Amino acid sequence: MSIFPTKILLATDGSEEARLAAQAAAELSKNTGSEVHVAYVLPSPRELRGHHLYSQEVMRSVLEQAEGEARTFLEEQAKQVGKSGGKVAETHLETGEPDKEIVRLSEELGAGTIVIGSRGLGAVRRALMGGVSESVVRHAHCPVFVVRE
């Protein structure tokens, strides 16, 4: 039995920290032989600020554009992980609350490690909003590798 995970869930969001997390996941995969699952979580329409101010058509258009951008970023991240020597198994585009969806997907996949970037929220914003990476660390069933800039 190996102490290294066979599956790594890389949670990405398009930020610079997420790109650094992708590098870390690639290196971990390369060194352990683990496969990498790359995930991006789009907020559901209910979670978007001001969603009730726009028509359904406008919201649908915004969400379609966001989904297209997320798919493009997911594919770029997967290619980058592969170019860096990581073994990419699959990409996952989910919708919902990012922290909850990351934890759910990690359990569903049987991931041994989650790799996620830290957005570096200041103390006040973190106290008011909480952070996705912080919530994932608290609720995940497996170790979480948080990458800082």
Name what the model sees in each region.
Residues 1-4, 76-114:
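Structural beta-alpha unit
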Residues 2-57:
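Small/aliphatic-rich secondary-structure junction motif
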Residues 39, 90-94, 145:
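General small-molecule cofactor/ligand-binding pocket signal
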Residues 53-57, 108-110, 132-133:
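Short, hinge-like loop/turn segments at secondary-structure boundaries
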Residues 57-72:
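A short acidic, glycine-rich active-site loop
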Residues 113-135:
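Glycine-rich, Arg-bearing micro-motifs that act as flexible, cationic patches
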Residues 142-149:
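Short, flexible loop segments at boundaries between secondary-structure elements
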